[in-house]
Amino acid sequence: MKIDLTTLVTESRNKASENIDVLSTVEMLTVINQEDQKVALAVEAILPQIADVVDAIAVAFQSGGRLIYTGAGTSGRLGILDASECPPTYGSNPDLVVGLIAGGHKAILKAVENAEDNRELGASDLQDLGLNEKDVLVGIAASGRTPYVLGAMEYAKSVGATVATLSCNPNSPMTELADINMTPVVGPEVVTGSSRMKAGTAQKLVLNMLTTGAMIRTGKVFGNLMVDVEATNAKLVQRQKNIVIEATGCSEVEASEALSQCDNHCKTAILMVLSGLDAQSAKAKLAQHNGFIRNALSDQ
């Protein structure tokens, strides 16, 4: 079956790089860098749509739902990367944000032939996860037409989940299925069709915003401090202390004492120092206010 890619922005030729193979190395890299500068502007143009998805994810988290990313190739790997960073950064359950890739885990390191063309696989992977109406699905595909992602989106719609799309081609088949469309149009790639470049960069920027925004909206950031970070290595043990110090103005000794009294739960230590509560009372107060430090502090 012939696939017509001629109408896709991501498959068109970039006039700025038509002679890139005869440029000096610095000139070549200058072209790439100049093209990359267009990416942030393309993302800026869709901030309202990104905000809608962030708010939907926050509601899902607060209602017992999850964020599920689905994609093939680079798009799938970027979703997995973003999902994998949430537990160490925000202390979240690994099941809260999940990344799926066409072809499964082996496709993370090596392309699995034809996996992205399997529409039924996109649906069955979500069935295996038990996707339901509380969840948010973000379908990721630069082209906006990947069958694996389309199958996943169709299944998500059928169970009542919120469906968003992240693609770099306007008016794609994916946009017709989504409740919310995020379409940063970055233009033709420096190497024609190599959507791991500008399109991939745009996707990474948007995914950063989705999880960061949702975690902020659900109380996992105080000021600009990652107050739910877990002390899983030496660097993060020190980071926890530094966060308590920054949030409260206390000494390192006081920060260490507070953390030791509350099983190294950063939020609890901060509330203990700022409110004078003991560890048990501080934990209870945080639970009462769904983990929001500011709300717990105002209820004194």
UniProtKB/Swiss-Prot annotation:
Record-stated family: Belongs to the GCKR-like family. MurNAc-6-P etherase subfamily.
Pfam families: GKRP_SIS_N (PF22645)
Source organism of the structure: Aliivibrio fischeri (strain ATCC 700601 / ES114) (Vibrio fischeri)
Molecular-function GO terms, alphabetical: carbohydrate derivative binding; carbon-oxygen lyase activity; ether hydrolase activity
Domain (SIS): residue spans on this chain: 57-220
Annotated keywords: Carbohydrate metabolism, Lyase
Pathway noted in the entry: Amino-sugar metabolism; 1,6-anhydro-N-acetylmuramate degradation; Amino-sugar metabolism; N-acetylmuramate degradation; Cell wall biogenesis; peptidoglycan recycling
Further details from the record: A lyase-type mechanism (elimination/hydration) is suggested for the cleavage of the lactyl ether bond of MurNAc 6-phosphate, with the formation of an alpha,beta-unsaturated aldehyde intermediate with (E)-stereochemistry, followed by the syn addition of water to give product.
Name of the coding gene: murQ
Function: Specifically catalyzes the cleavage of the D-lactyl ether substituent of MurNAc 6-phosphate, producing GlcNAc 6-phosphate and D-lactate. Together with AnmK, is also required for the utilization of anhydro-N-acetylmuramic acid (anhMurNAc) either imported from the medium or derived from its own cell wall murein, and thus plays a role in cell wall recycling.
NCBIfam families noted in UniProt: N-acetylmuramic acid 6-phosphate etherase, PRK05441.1, PRK12570.1
Name the record gives this protein: N-acetylmuramic acid 6-phosphate etherase
Gene Ontology biological-process entries: 1,6-anhydro-N-acetyl-beta-muramic acid catabolic process; amino sugar catabolic process; N-acetylmuramic acid catabolic process; peptidoglycan turnover
EC number: 4.2.1.126
